[in-house]
């Protein structure tokens, strides 16, 4: 099972990249628009990977932001929501908008996404109602870490880029991990 890939971006399309690893192997990885907006061609990056193996295909989906990866993995568990539709949701909604729409039960936010109709929007809200707490806690931890790092004098733009790559789950660990990357 592939969980992460580090390499140079040798090809970049809006929702697909090719990463060439140091061993010379290149991997094709599907990414969201938010993800692809955070790096350039010929840049070295590391993507967390969700690997989906089916009878007729083997696809890799990459994420810089662990919250976006969690969102994708929650969505693909819903009946009728495949990886392509889940990635369309990740490209159209940031995790905060996604959580807010879930919390408020706002189907209209989901229906704006290509491939999501009224039935799918209702299904997303119904099936992910249990997941709301995990998403909320994750967003609160990131918000608290952001506030703490801002108070230390770091620029918000730099902090947000670093927090997207952090894998820690609670505020204090996020701050420690971010400080190592910002220093």
Curated annotation (Swiss-Prot):
Q: Organism source for this protein?
A: Campylobacter lari (strain RM2100 / D67 / ATCC BAA-1060)
- The gene name reads ruvA
Instruction: Write out the function statement from the record.
Output: The RuvA-RuvB-RuvC complex processes Holliday junction (HJ) DNA during genetic recombination and DNA repair, while the RuvA-RuvB complex plays an important role in the rescue of blocked DNA replication forks via replication fork reversal (RFR). RuvA specifically binds to HJ cruciform DNA, conferring on it an open structure. The RuvB hexamer acts as an ATP-dependent pump, pulling dsDNA into and through the RuvAB complex. HJ branch migration allows RuvC to scan DNA until it finds its consensus sequence, where it cleaves and resolves the cruciform DNA.
Q: What InterPro entries does the database record attribute to this sequence?
A: DNA_helicase_Holl-junc_RuvA_I (IPR013849), Hlx-hairpin-Hlx_DNA-bd_motif (IPR003583), NA-bd_OB-fold (IPR012340), RuvA (IPR000085), RuvA_2-like (IPR010994), RuvA_C (IPR011114), RuvA_C_sf (IPR036267)
Q: Where is this region: Domain II?
A: 65-138
- Subunit (UniProt): Homotetramer. Forms an RuvA(8)-RuvB(12)-Holliday junction (HJ) complex. HJ DNA is sandwiched between 2 RuvA tetramers; dsDNA enters through RuvA and exits via RuvB. An RuvB hexamer assembles on each DNA strand where it exits the tetramer. Each RuvB hexamer is contacted by two RuvA subunits (via domain III) on 2 adjacent RuvB subunits; this complex drives branch migration. In the full resolvosome a probable DNA-RuvA(4)-RuvB(12)-RuvC(2) complex forms which resolves the HJ.
Similarity section: Belongs to the RuvA family.
Q: Which UniProt keywords apply?
A: Cytoplasm, DNA damage, DNA recombination, DNA repair, DNA-binding
> Could you give one GO CC term from the UniProt record?
Holliday junction resolvase complex
Region: Domain III; residue ranges are 138-183
Gene3D superfamilies in the record, alphabetically? Answer: 5' to 3' exonuclease, C-terminal subdomain, DNA helicase RuvA subunit, C-terminal domain, Nucleic acid-binding proteins
User: Where is it mostly found?
Assistant: cytoplasm
Q: Kindly indicate whether the keyword Cytoplasm belongs to this entry.
A: yes
Q: Where in the cell is it found?
A: Cytoplasm
Q: What is this protein called?
A: Holliday junction branch migration complex subunit RuvA
Q: What is known of its domains?
A: Has three domains with a flexible linker between the domains II and III and assumes an 'L' shape. Domain III is highly mobile and contacts RuvB.
